[in-house]
């Protein structure tokens, strides 16, 4: 082992130091190119498409291994986003039906949403405080809901289907943003649990509202309501000082762990800080985001753990650097972020040029791919083809027999974050004027030629699957400008059959051309 001794002024300095040295002892990890992101998207969207059902309550993609519906957090009305991104009429109409269902069945009088509903149409309570009998909902779920509702609207606009955005959906998003604003002005925080009927806070404290500033910032821009942006800034400053600067941890984001420290809230708060940078162009948010990214890295495996040779992960020789520890209670890691692509880490890399942020989200994506069930040669969940589940267990916290072994089940949220990473992260990011690139997808890339206005890249697909790889190219000057929410819609792609190599010219306008 190695001990680092250094002077530090505060917790943010400690966190940023940790980010710089977290891989120094063992050196860089070696992620495997196993599963192209396009293949993962294909398999996971097939699972999700087959899960669309109609019940007495309404029509929706199942977010759990039951027929009941749970809003956001573990994928409800988040798994709709990659299905909408497929840009076909069948899934577009299904997504529309689910948004109708959510807006009509789950929104309370206050503007906040209830956390779930049974297939038979009965509202589902959260894990409630017994001395507070009113039906409550997680603030975290409502924070997700505001962000993802408007992301759906922006994706429809980017696809050319703005006419499909219903006034009822927009009104629901407005009411939710207004509810958050009202709560903030009344209490100076968002709390952890709220009462959708009245808007009353049932349980105070925690960082359960970590994603709320992102939702409010995007809502302020979409609806041209600047007051919500001010609330977003005030709330983000509050949480940053209270939880990041003063404690070096965030919590309260998961429904099963009370207010324990967790990764979800930390990563969700990074989403908010990057959203505020996007909508204000104020670099103080970027500075806060760098500290927050360092905190997020502390929840992520920095090395390829050695698993028992007889375990499932050991037999597969999986490289698990990038697995994300969910919380201090769960005592295991998971494939990916609950529930997001983590594209804010890519955006932070793009804005700062610090490759450590790109390495972090690349590790997360590649560890996720290792957990995907791909029979007959890469079996993890013993479940559906393309499925994954939430346990990557490098410790004996659940018993020695659990180390390196999966559980025979699947989780929609892990499959959903895999879909989101496949969409919202570019396969290759290129700065043409510098001749620099970074590869997120599971291919090998080398620079063959650099000219003033273009580069030529060699792309090799050594995996067992054909790959469709997105390329996001720009100049270093353009990288100073934030990119829109649904930017991936406009990224060109190149097809690379399994085992083959192609050459592609990428110009400074982001256009690509296959070369012989």
How does the language model describe each region?
Residues 1-179, 473-475, 482-516:
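Carbohydrate-recognition beta-sandwich/jelly-roll modules
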